[in-house]
UniProtKB/Swiss-Prot annotation:
Gene3D superfamilies recorded: Cystine-knot cytokines
GO terms, molecular function: follicle-stimulating hormone activity
Signal peptide (residue range): 1-20
GO CC annotation: cytoplasm; extracellular space; follicle-stimulating hormone complex
Protein family: Belongs to the glycoprotein hormones subunit beta family.
Principal localisation: secreted
SUBUNIT field: Heterodimer. The active follitropin is a heterodimer composed of an alpha chain/CGA shared with other hormones and a unique beta chain/FSHB shown here.
Gene that this polypeptide is encoded by: FSHB
Species the sequence originates in: Ailuropoda melanoleuca
Protein name, as recorded: Follitropin subunit beta
Residues the record marks as carrying a glycan: 25, 42
Function: Together with the alpha chain CGA constitutes follitropin, the follicle-stimulating hormone, and provides its biological specificity to the hormone heterodimer. Binds FSHR, a G protein-coupled receptor, on target cells to activate downstream signaling pathways. Follitropin is involved in follicle development and spermatogenesis in reproductive organs.
Keyword Ubl conjugation: no
SUPFAM superfamilies, per database record: Cystine-knot cytokines (SSF57501)
Length: 129
């Protein structure tokens, strides 16, 4: 009986203390090459923890897939980048996560590297608010 109570308390602690994979507000920096500066945009993305494990013995017959907190559903929003030249396309479309889950990192749509550029990277010197 004591082990059941201990297990129950551990599960309650984990649910309260450990953030699971969920939507969160972030600020990203976007740039248009034609406009030569960056702007900051508030959007929604997925963040949190997913249960994972790294086995000591690697079984080649069973792939070791690490799960990450990633989007399940996306919507796209478009913003007009101010100050672009008249002939330049001043519209920028960016993803907004609407639902999250723990799953395999899809390198076709996500930067799965350990050290990516980060959401505030700008290749130009000038930032506009």
């Amino acid at each position: 009986m004591k082990s059941v109570q201990l297990c129950f308390l551990f599960c309650c602690w984990r649910a309260i203390c450990c953030k699971s994979c969920e939507l969160t507000n972030i600020t990203i920096t976007v740039e248009k090459e034609e406009c030569r500066f960056c702007i900051s945009i508030n959007t929604t993305w997925c963040a949190g923890y997913c249960y994972t494990r790294d086995l000591v013995y690697k079984d080649p017959a069973r792939p070791n897939i690490q799960k990450i907190c990633t989007f399940k559903e996306l919507a796209y929003e478009t913003v007009k980048v101010p100050g672009c030249a008249h002939q330049a396309d001043s519209l920028y479309t960016y993803p907004v996560a609407t639902e999250c889950h723990c799953g395999k990192c899809d390198s076709d749509s996500t930067d799965c590297t350990v050290r990516g550029l980060g959401p505030s990277y700008c290749s130009f010197n000038e930032m506009k608010e």
